[in-house]
A protein has these predicted regions:
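Short, glycine-/small- and polar/acidic-enriched structural segments
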Residues: 27-162, 166-172, 179, 186-192, ...
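Pocket-lining segment of extracytoplasmic ligand-binding domains
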Residues: 91, 122, 173-267
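Short polybasic/polar patches that bind polyanions
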Residues: 50-51, 56, 155, 199-200, ...
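Secondary-structure end/capping motifs
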Residues: 230-312
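Soluble non-cytosolic domains of exported or imported proteins
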Residues: 40, 67-71, 86, 144-145, ...
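Conserved C-terminal helix/tail region of periplasmic/extracytoplasmic solute-binding proteins
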Residues: 302-334
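Short, low-complexity disordered leader/linker segments with a strong preference
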Residues: 1-31, 331-334
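Predominant activation on well-ordered alpha-helical scaffold segments within soluble catalytic domains
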Residues: 47, 93, 151, 196, ...
């Protein structure tokens, strides 16, 4: 065999060895099936944790899917189709109140504000909530926290939902933006980056933040079935470590830097739109500094649910939210 042939053979063997090593390494990672409620820049710390390899550092590989609704995400978790469900705790409360034995438990929090911004099709020179009186808002699903927060904010500003203003609630989350852009409604409450895209096309203007108006609350949380959480706490501990690394990374980097990292999760969105969206969420303190769920914020969520008529009585924090794992993650950093 010629010297050149030997070199080619050695290179080929080296490539195969690297591929086999990578495959073996991947096989050593424990797969976590994660269902997120929607795809939004609002969940930037999660995407950073995936993109920067923080889960791999914990021996985990995330199989990420998007449910497009808290109800759908909760159903997937209950059925065992996923290991972790990322959605609003309102779904957990509803399931518990239906008498489920192996109910869902939240173990780590990612967001503590409503992620919706409020857009006007034809904005006044200066926005006031009085402007919406007699108009039509493209809202969200009845019973979901985005819709309940919108109603809360309207009431706090003297506007009675469905009486002083029409609210469209029958559209699927992913269809609402297209309907508004096609001419439906005078206003819309929606997550980023959808509204910044509309604004860039000159078809509306962001005039307010529902999250800033509604105040801090337990908004989007990682959940597991109670039995699974108790059976394998180490899995969820490692998962929470990775999420907290994502939180810390986002806190210590600019909107531009974060946007570049999460861009692969939004292949159809221009980078400048992602940067703007990140800046909007940073401006309202959308993310808590730790994954520990706040009892006071959970109570505020239930206050909003009670006001919306979606809850008859408050559920004790300790029943549905478990802070021990997130608290342990913080202890490890001391």
């Amino acid at each position: 065999m010629s010297k050149k042939a030997w070199i080619v053979l050695l290179v080929a063997v080296g490539i195969v060895a690297v591929l086999l090593g990578a495959t073996a390494s991947a096989q050593n990672l424990e797969v976590v099936r994660l269902s997120e409620v929607v795809r939004s820049v609002f969940y930037a710390p999660q995407y950073v944790a995936i993109a920067k390899g923080f889960f791999e550092e914990q021996g985990l590989r995330v199989d990420l899917s998007t449910a497009w609704g808290a109800d759908k995400g909760a159903a997937a978790l209950i059925s065992g189709a996923v290991d972790v469900g990322f959605f609003g705790p309102e779904a957990t409360i509803y399931i518990y109140q239906q008498g489920a034995q192996d109910h869902l438990v939240g173990f780590a929090q990612l967001t503590e504000r409503d992620g919706s911004f409020f857009m006007a099709r034809d904005p006044a020179e200066e926005f006031s909530w009085e402007n919406v009186r007699g108009k039509t808002i493209v809202g969200a699903r009845i019973g979901g926290v985005p819709q309940m927060c919108l109603e809360w904010v309207l009431k706090q500003n003297g506007i009675q939902p469905f009486e002083d203003v029409e609210i469209i609630t029958g559209l699927a989350f992913e269809a609402a933006v297209g309907a508004f852009e096609a001419g439906l409604g005078d206003y819309i409450a929606q997550f980023e980056p959808a509204l910044s895209e509309i604004e860039a096309r000159g078809r509306g203007k962001i005039v307010a933040s529902i999250g800033a108006e509604a105040g801090p609350l337990t908004y989007t949380v990682y959940h597991a079935r109670k039995s699974v959480l108790e059976k394998n706490p180490d899995l969820f501990l490692r998962f929470t470590r990775a999420i907290h690394q994502g939180q810390l990374w986002v806190y210590s980097h600019s909107a531009e830097e974060v946007a570049e990292v999460i861009a692969p999760f939004f292949p159809l969105i221009d980078l400048d739109i992602l940067v703007k969206s990140m800046g909007l969420y940073q401006s309202i303190d959308a993310w808590p500094p730790t994954p520990v769920i706040s009892e006071a914020h959970f109570l505020h969520l239930q206050e909003i649910m009670l006001e919306a008529g979606e809850l008859e009585q408050v559920v004790p924090f300790q029943v549905l939210m478990d802070t021990t794992i997130a608290e342990r993650v913080l202890e490890e950093l001391k």
